[in-house]
A protein has these predicted regions:
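Short, surface-exposed basic-aromatic patches at helix termini and helix-loop junctions that form
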Residues: 57-61, 210-217, 280
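C-terminal functional module detector
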Residues: 28-29, 33, 46, 52-56, ...
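Catalytic-domain carbohydrate-binding cleft regions of carbohydrate-active enzymes
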Residues: 223-224, 248, 265
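A metal-dependent hydrolase metal-coordination microenvironment
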Residues: 31-199, 204-208, 229-233, 237-243, ...
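Bacterial N-terminal signal peptides
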Residues: 13-26
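N-terminal secretory signal peptides that target proteins for export/translocation
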Residues: 1-12
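Structural recognition of alpha->loop->beta junctions
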Residues: 210-230, 287-296
Length: 426
């Protein structure tokens, strides 16, 4: 475990200085567009229950512009046959696969026991079968599935070039750092744009804010994951991932470690039965404002923070300047919207309390309510926050009154998370 941190000096504004906002808007060149994508998805290459091509076609039909299949500790770059009777939903999935893609595409054979086997297509094959330049993009990815003792630690690598095995380590933070380093080293070695992100910190109560706050080379965190086991909202003893994000942001920005952006993903595994017990598609996604639908443009925009995360709320525009952060929400009839502008001000209370382990697992420390406080709450479709000048960062969370179509928990409504605008950084 990392040592608990102290906000020495910086809490009084002594070591903070005005910083640029994380995203800016081009004054020339092609007009940017919003592109919808999911960067955490599973198929028969690991523990998903559908063929890659069928999964991608479904996202395409739902209006997604880009998708990454991120199977556990594997890339789709080798010959692999699956036995239909051994895979979940095998017979039904094979029928749909054959109907959609035809017998010339679906390769089948019988094993020595007469059981039907199907060859899983490699990435180059399945991506080319559904990709449509300028309209639908497929990225090669991996969920690096690691652990420390009993704690599951997962890092996604988006647009990866070569398989990265779990790197291991001597603590939670050490494992995560090694896995992040491996992705970033591959990027340097191959000169291929790619990035890592830390997955579902509350899954298995594996990752605390203290584990995340001093990591290097990680600019993204799943603030929402649609799997029913990941505990986005926390509980009475564990903070929500939203709260973890604010704790991490405050520490990093007051210690010169840089911003972390929030992502939403669905972490889909189950594509047939849609209910709250299944990890279904289309529960969470990112909307990226990029000049074109290419891998480079999507990654550039995300690394600049020019995207938002959503479970259903649509934003037409996000604008920030030296004076304000302004949103334009795409409203629906009969739906109300309230936007919370959230941040931490210089001079915040640095009080911190370590908490006892719960069932042998560390728990995120307790911090002042000054961290990630609600700076303003604005109803309507055009919420704006005028900077007071002492904010370290400001982010926005939009809450609608419209229920999500396939909730994990009763009462879930559609949300959107706007990336933090960094006002003051060490």
């Amino acid at each position: 475990m990392p040592q608990p941190f102290l906000f020495e000096g910086v809490a009084r504004g002594v070591r903070v200085a005005l910083a640029l906002v994380p995203f800016a808007f081009a004054a020339c060149g092609p007009s940017p567009h919003w592109y919808k994508g999911n960067l955490h998805t599973h198929s028969y290459w690991s523990d998903g229950n559908q063929f890659p091509e069928v999964i991608l076609e479904r996202y395409k039909d739902r209006g997604y512009d880009f998708v990454a299949l991120s199977d556990h500790n594997v890339l789709a770059d080798s010959e692999r046959w699956v036995t239909v009777s051994d895979i979940p939903n095998g017979t039904t999935s094979l029928g749909e696969y054959s109907s959609a893609f035809g017998p010339d595409w679906v390769e089948q054979r019988q094993d020595d026991s007469g059981r039907t086997q199907v060859r899983l297509k490699r990435f180059e094959e399945y991506a080319s079968s559904v990709a449509d330049p300028g309209k639908f993009l497929v990225l090669q990815s991996e969920e690096i599935t690691d652990h420390f003792e009993s704690r599951p630690l997962h890092v996604n690598a988006t647009n990866i070039a070569e398989l990265i095995p779990p790197q291991g380590g001597a603590s939670v933070a050490d494992v995560l750092q090694h896995d992040l380093d491996a992705v970033n080293e591959q990027r340097r070695a191959t000169d291929q744009p790619m990035f890592p992100h830390v997955n579902h910190p509350n899954y298995g109560w594996a990752v605390t804010a203290e584990d995340l706050m001093d990591l290097h080379g990680d600019r993204f965190l799943e603030v929402y994951n649609g799997h029913p086991l990941v505990r986005n909202e926390g509980d009475s003893l564990h903070p929500s991932v939203d709260r973890i994000w604010d704790i991490v942001l405050t520490h990093r920005l007051t210690h010169g470690l840089g911003v972390v952006y929030g992502m939403a993903v669905d972490d889909a595994h189950h594509y047939e039965q849609m209910d709250s017990t299944r990890a279904n598609p289309a529960r969470g996604w990112v909307m990226v404002r990029a000049k074109e639908l290419t891998t480079d443009a999507i990654i550039d925009a995300m690394e600049a923070g020019d995207f938002y995360a959503s479970t259903g709320v649509v934003l037409d525009d996000i604008q920030s300047s030296s004076k304000r952060l302004a949103l334009r929400i795409h409203g629906e009839d009969g739906v109300t919207y309230v936007t919370q502008f959230i941040g931490t001000r210089a001079g915040f209370d640095t009080a911190e309390q370590a908490l006892p382990d719960v069932e042998g697992l560390p728990v995120t420390h307790r911090y002042s309510a000054d961290i990630g406080t609600v700076l303003a709450e604005v109803p309507g479709l055009d919420p704006t926050y005028a900077f007071a000048g002492d904010e370290i960062y400001v982010r926005a969370r939009v809450r609608s009154s419209k229920p999500v179509a396939n909730p994990v928990h009763a009462g879930e409504v559609q949300l959107a998370w706007v990336q933090p605008v960094v006002r003051r950084a060490n």
